[in-house]
Amino acid sequence: MKGLIARFIAGFALLLWAWDMVFPWQQLMQAEENRYNQIQQRKILRVGMVNHPLSYFIGAEGTAGIEYELAKSFANYLDVRLDIKTFDNSEQLFSALKDNKVDIAAAGLLYQPELSKQFQIGSAYYSASWQVVYKKGSNRPYKLSELEGDLIIPAGSAVLPILQRLKEDNPKLSWQTTNQFTQEELLLQVAEGKIPYTVGISVDISAAQHIRPNIAVGFDLTDEAPVLWYLPNSSYSELQAAVLDFMNHANETGLISRIEEKYFNHLAHFDYVDIQSYLKAIKLVLPKYQSLFEKYRGDLEWQMLAAIAYQESHWDPNATSPTGVRGMMMLTRDTAERMKITDRTSAEQSIRAGSEYLHMLMRQIPETVPKEDRIWYGLAAYNMGLGHLLDVRRLTRQLGGNPDNWLDVKKNLPLLAEKRHYSGLKYGYARGFEAFQYVENIRRYYSSIINHQRVEEQQIQNNEEQSSVPQEISKESDSTLKE
């Protein structure tokens, strides 16, 4: 990532020098007032976004998303207020950018040559590709010529110019558009067999697979491309330079790494059987215990407490292990006595004690650990003991890392099982690799509960407002959309 940012800065510096030779800045200033100065004068940064489960959304804990967190940090960097303006699709967003209604377009947008001719490129912070998806179990297409039906895509999608370009070499390629469904909803329609194919961005597909595991990737429609911000083409490049400076700062301070860890890391592991079992349990078992998770959640979201319990026992209050731990939260006898519970197989007693014990551990974590990361430290301590957590913090410091940065700490957890490392630590050997996987699993389970609930709520709303998909798809592909 650092190399990518450095190359972008060098490239843009050369570009700006060449542009200055051809078209003096004074002419630009006469044509339009400096966009960067406009932002500073109004003390507001206007960023256009599209509601999206990874980029921008309003959840139980407030506004969140990759683009939101980056934009919020950039506004703070400029010492201005952030004003989010939302649009239904990329087409509307770019229209607003062209009409000076927003200063930046940030919506998980991939680099496209066509767009780079119309707008300035702001910054790149991860990469992704467009992929064709189908339902697992049906015939897999390996290339465009093997599609046995139309692609269904949202109206105004950023993939439209790509499809139009691909059609030049694939004249039989056809697609239909719909105004009624988002890209995420179309992925779910594929999973349910209601439509044959759609196209999505690779990270979005990975996220969708954790709530509908029968979504499968047929093939890559494009190579990986940078995901970046777009800026008005007519603006003086001081805004562009500010964006690049900020992204370089965000990379050096670890902000980008922390955001990627938060939104992407749990997507790396995909186990079809495990996810199928988990989703079945969410529907059939979780409702029995949801009220208890809500009652004893403390400072946690109840979904997080539920995810911990699933990792511990798969929501089985009678679960046992050869090591002697028992119950929904798999408590040891000593912990049960310490938390004053009399029956470890009581779901309520176990959930209460597990939550109280986790909160107790989190209170003992140094205050220098950021609030948003304390839960991960607490979970590691819950799994392997507070002493070993303190050991891995010391080890992280010895190895030149930051003990208050979860990314630095978690990569050192497996080292607690290596003699050359644990022999010099106060609490000695620990199965740190298990603690590492324990935390990763809980993050994945937590995310799946959140997304499953959101999708279920959206589908209920759609069922109330809309009829079936085939009647709502607009067959415009061979006329206005593909000239």
UniProtKB/Swiss-Prot annotation:
Protein name (record): Membrane-bound lytic murein transglycosylase F
Catalytic machinery residues: E312
Family, per entry: In the N-terminal section; belongs to the bacterial solute-binding protein 3 family.
Gene: mltF
Region (Non-LT domain): 19-267
Domain characteristics, as noted in the entry: The N-terminal domain does not have lytic activity and probably modulates enzymatic activity. The C-terminal domain is the catalytic active domain.
EC number: 4.2.2.n1
Region described as LT domain: 269-483
Organism whose genome encodes this protein: Actinobacillus pleuropneumoniae serotype 7 (strain AP76)
UniProt GO molecular function: peptidoglycan lytic transglycosylase activity
